[in-house]
Amino acid sequence: MTNELKGRVNYSVNGNIAILEVDNPPVNPLSSGVRAGLAEYISKANEDDSIEGIILTGAGKSFIAGADISEFGQKSDGPDLHTALKDIEFSKKPVLAAINGTALGGGLETALVCNYRMGTNKAIVGLPEVNLGLLPGAGGTQRLPRLIGPSQALKMMLAGTPMSAKKALQQGVIDAISENSLMDDAIAFLQEKIGSETHPKVRDKNEKVLEARGDDNVLAEAKALAAKTRRGQFAPGQIISCVEAAINEDDFDVGMKKESEYFLECLMNPQREAMIHIFFGERAASKISDIPKETPLLPINSAGIVGSG
């Protein structure tokens, strides 16, 4: 991999299984080098006749924390995220996402293009883009409703809060939880699936969206929830419109196109810039220099306004 790209993917082989490890510390965002590495090594595994399955995981304590928002609005080298994810989704060999920690935003969207998903008991998944004035723009609004149903998907995306592995398993976001060695369990799980003639793609799971077609309550309840919890925000309405497309469009790619259009509208909306500014500001404030780590938190009992005239 070229050193000019940010982040990388490590490639190793265990028997007939190729292991792709996203390595972009500290939280493994989907930076340019990661996207390039995914595209390169998915292709390599598919071209190797000795490889029968692929495991995608993350280095350290995070699977993939999401998109690299520092690249938003900037030209970057390497394949775009949609291209890299499409390579995974249409892999000739089955792909399992071994979620070793945090899988948020683009991280969960990456797991959703894999055929199977397994997490540790401490894994965290979620689509928090709404908190940045955005919507899940890498297929999350189209795949998640197909996997767990439009109603649950809307609640998850509008809340923007992380979900535990236990709840993710209950709702069907992941297929299994590893209680021991994630890699050992992932290899064993995938070995059982290798002999299957077909390996499910989330994009092809239409039963739940077809069940919601014609049920006005699904979208009405989501709009009521957004009005209550996200009053005045732009992105929630766009998320609902995306899921409406997932429900009503017969062609998955048409829904994806609408998601891209609505994502761009969110990206250009002033709210997005303000909310991302707040996000970076809060992160910076939490890392104020010269404050000892042992400094205790103190309650605020009163506050005064200075310079009010």
Regions flagged by a language model, labelled:
Residues 1-57, 79, 83-86:
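Conserved CoA-thioester-binding segment of acyl-CoA-metabolizing enzymes
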Residues 296, 301-309:
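Glycine-rich adenosine-cofactor-binding loop
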Residues 141-151:
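Hydrophobic, secondary-structure "cap" segments at the distal end of domains
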Residues 2-21, 65, 109, 113, ...:
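Amphipathic alpha-helical segments at domain termini/boundaries
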Residues 88-132, 136, 307:
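Glycine-rich beta-to-alpha active-site loop
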Residues 57-87, 103, 131-134:
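Glycine- (often His-adjacent) and acidic-residue-rich active-site loop
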